[in-house]
Amino acid sequence: MIYWILLALAIVSEITGTLALKWASVGGGHAGFILMLVMISLSYILLSFSVKRIALGVAYALWEGVGIVLITLFSVLLFNETLTVQKALGLLVLIAGILLIKTGTRTVSRKAEVRHVAG
């Protein structure tokens, strides 16, 4: 469970960092770039811890996919960017892909993982 929490925090950090990048570019100054650097770095650190127990493909798909969806939505709300039908369809396809990856990944028990490493 803790690894899923770490992944969720990694996603929140990525979203915050990316939005800070946009904020800095439209007038947030140096504080925005510093926030971006800290949050993106934290995001990668948290992601690296989460993949200890979550399959890499699943963790990365969720981290990147959920991040893209939420960054797009927040960009529309905070920065008045447009959400066209084509973009919305792209986000739906992305969500469908994430769900397919998640449901198509089997979980490995801790015992099987230890046996595999032990040889």
Curated annotation (Swiss-Prot):
InterPro entries registered for this protein in UniProt? Small_drug/metabolite_transptr, Small_multidrug_res
Query: In which family does this protein belong, per the annotation?
Result: Belongs to the drug/metabolite transporter (DMT) superfamily. Small multidrug resistance (SMR) (TC 2.A.7.1) family. MdtJ subfamily.
Q: Which UniProt keywords are listed?
A: Cell inner membrane, Cell membrane, Membrane, Transmembrane, Transmembrane helix, Transport
What role does this protein play? Catalyzes the excretion of spermidine.
Question: For this chain's UniProt record, which GO biological process terms are given?
Answer: glycine betaine transport; spermidine transmembrane transport
Q: What is its main location?
A: membrane
Does the keyword Cell wall biogenesis/degradation belong to this entry?
no
Q: Membrane spanning segments where? A: 1-21, 31-51, 54-74, 81-101
Give the location in the cell.
Cell inner membrane
Q: Name one GO molecular function term.
A: amino-acid betaine transmembrane transporter activity
How is the subunit organization of this protein annotated in UniProt?
Forms a complex with MdtI.
In terms of Pfam families, this protein maps to: Multi_Drug_Res (PF00893)
SUPFAM superfamilies given in the database record: Multidrug resistance efflux transporter EmrE
PANTHER family assigned: SMR FAMILY PROTON-DEPENDENT DRUG EFFLUX TRANSPORTER SUGE (PTHR30561), SPERMIDINE EXPORT PROTEIN MDTJ (PTHR30561:SF2)
Answer yes or no on keyword Cell membrane: yes
One Gene Ontology term, aspect cellular component = plasma membrane
Its protein name is Spermidine export protein MdtJ
User: What kind of membrane protein is this, topologically?
Assistant: Multi-pass membrane protein
Which residues constitute the signal peptide according to the record? none
